[in-house]
């Protein structure tokens, strides 16, 4: 919090460091402490500054490691954190499930159809994943809390994840394409006129 306050009080330095960018991606790796996005306004102020004073188009990307799907309680905690960040930042937002290449590496022959279908339930959070757990493993006190979490996710239906596999160029390009889309990148550019086919034929 102190670091962000210090940064926001030294905007001349920040402006110099940002320099002049033209059609570039500027990636700002923010701290992972969720309280910065849910309990304090420092990140929101920083985002507002980037948009209004420095005229950047901003897209927040929330990253959740794929190992979270091994623990459903941790996974749904991540879903709630993503939802909280989306609501509090109130900007274009994507949620990304990282390290999906490591998931496939656990299987020598790749993922089966059933395994792929199961993973899809985590890309579009399926509240019934909680119901799949063995209730004998859960403390009865948490049953009502689990049901409340499930109901909250169902009511908002805001969170979904894009899978990021660093070994797949297609996966990386999909992420870039989605970021461009939510930021409306390129919409201000002049359309490219098609070539004059008649003149082209005449020159052949």
Predicted segments — roles?
Residues 15-33, 37-69, 81-95:
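Inter-motif core of Ras-like GTPase G domains
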Residues 4-6, 16, 25, 186, ...:
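Charge-biased, low-complexity intrinsically disordered regions
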Residues 1-11:
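Conserved nucleotide-sensing/catalytic segment adjacent to the nucleotide-binding pocket
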Residues 55, 59-204:
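Conserved GTP-binding G-domain of TRAFAC-class P-loop NTPases and closely related GTPase folds
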Residues 1-3, 32-34, 132-135:
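Acidic/glycine-enriched edge-of-secondary-structure segments
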Residues 4, 36, 72:
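Flexible, glycine- and charge-enriched loops at secondary-structure boundaries
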